[in-house]
Structure formats: C-alpha cells, structure tokens
C-alpha cells in the first residue's frame, strides 16, 4: 500500500492511495447482511475485498484538496474525488482556529457516492449528504490529549454525535478511541449496540526509536 501527496501549488494538493495484495485469506471473512436501517453502507465490504486478490493495483484514494483562508483565523478546504475504498464524492470543510487558543470549531458537508466493487471509477446506486458540526480541544496538561465532538448526519442517514479522544506521542505514535450514538436503535444496530472502536498509527521510519513518550 502506498500513500503519496502531490503539492501542485501552496494551496492545492492531490492525495493518492494505491493498494496491491500479495497474500490474504479474505475468502474466510463472513459479515452478516444488514436488512434494516441504517442503510448497508459498510457491511458489504467483502464485495470490495474479494476483488483485492485479482484486481491488480487498486485505487484506495485519488483526492484533490483546495485550501483557502478568506479571513484571519477562518479556514476552508474544498475536496473532490475518490475519498476512500468505498466512497467518492465532493464537499467542503470550514474551520475557525486562533493560534493562541487550544480549541477550534467548524462544520463539514459532503455529498458521497458509493463506489463500484471493482475499485475503479464506477458508482453503485447509493448516495447521501453528510453534514456535521465539530468542536476540537487540545489539553496541554500533565497527560496531554486531544478531544473531538462531532454532531450531525452520518453516512447511513442516521443522526447523532461522536465523542473521540486521542493522543500523539513525540515519536509519532498516535492512538485513540471513539464512540458514536445516533437515532439507530439497539435492535437495528445489532451486535455491539452502538458504533465504537480504537485506532492507532505507528510509524516505521523516522523518529520511532525516540522512546520519550
């Protein structure tokens, strides 16, 4: 898997992600089908994964981002293209941030379209408009951490909010946890009751040998 960023000019960027599978056991993966609300936006991921082995080089992302600052402390980013493995689209983000504070807030709105299972440029018959209000806070105390609260409409059309905590260490290691609560009932969601998880990123080059956490 390869991630590349092309800087076309100081305010225009093109980001790509290309994938190639050397070996996998994805044929053994089983995900029960979803036949109730929310819409099946992720549970058919195996339809994408089964093409990884024989699909050659696959496009995970091909995204164009344009940044502008129309006024002091007001930042806008407009994006279009293939956002990720399963969705393409277009949209924009607004962020208000002042350098002397430890918080920011903003809004993002995106129109997204579900990609075809072959990972190329075709689209399936699903689309939605996502919109969220966002608040970000950075704690500089003894145990520094970042907090993010987002509220709005999500990919499946459900409405609710997400609470996320994360921490970035001096050597570049990054990890966190999140929980999302929406108007989807426990019965509709199924196993797990609500969306939650952890995430992490461990660099394999650069400053990883710095153990000053």
Question: Model-flagged regions — what are they?
Answer:
Residues 2-6, 64-68, 92-96, 133-137, ...:
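Residues on the lipid-exposed face of transmembrane beta-strands in outer-membrane beta-barrel proteins
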Residues 56-62, 86-90, 125-131, 157-161, ...:
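Residues that define the transmembrane beta-barrel architecture of outer-membrane proteins
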Residues 1-64, 68, 121-125:
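Outer-membrane beta-barrel initiation region
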Residues 22-28, 72, 84-88, 100-102, ...:
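Gram-negative outer-membrane beta-barrel proteins
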Residues 1, 16-18, 47-50, 72-84, ...:
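Transmembrane beta-strand segments that form the barrel wall of outer-membrane beta-barrel proteins
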Residues 36-42, 124, 140, 144-162, ...:
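Flexible, glycine-rich linker and terminal segments associated
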Residues 73-75, 81, 85-86, 93-146:
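Detector for outer-membrane/organellar transmembrane beta-barrel domains
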Residues 6-14, 69-73, 99-104, 140-147, ...:
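Short loop/turn motifs that connect adjacent beta-strands in outer-membrane beta-barrel proteins
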């Amino acid at each position: 898997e390869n991630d590349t960023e092309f800087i076309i000019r100081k305010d225009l960027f093109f980001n790509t992600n290309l994938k190639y599978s050397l070996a996998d056991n994805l044929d053994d993966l089983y995900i029960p089908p979803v036949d109730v609300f929310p819409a099946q936006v992720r549970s058919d991921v195996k339809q994408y994964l089964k093409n990884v082995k024989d699909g050659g080089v696959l496009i995970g992302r091909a995204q164009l981002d344009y940044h502008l600052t129309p006024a002091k402390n007001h930042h806008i980013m407009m994006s279009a293209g293939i956002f990720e493995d399963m969705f393409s689209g277009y949209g924009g983000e607004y962020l208000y941030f002042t350098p002397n504070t430890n918080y920011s807030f903003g809004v993002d709105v995106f129109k997204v379209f579900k990609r075809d299972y072959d990972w190329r440029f075709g689209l399936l018959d699903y689309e939605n408009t996502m919109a969220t209000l966002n608040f970000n806070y950075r704690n500089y105390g003894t145990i520094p951490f970042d907090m993010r609260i987002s509220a709005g409409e999500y990919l499946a059309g459900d409405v609710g909010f997400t609470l996320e905590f994360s921490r970035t260490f001096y050597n570049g290691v990054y990890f966190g946890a999140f929980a999302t609560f929406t108007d989807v009932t426990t019965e509709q969601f199924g196993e797990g009751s609500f969306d939650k998880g952890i995430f992490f990123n461990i660099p394999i080059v650069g400053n990883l040998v710095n153990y000053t956490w």
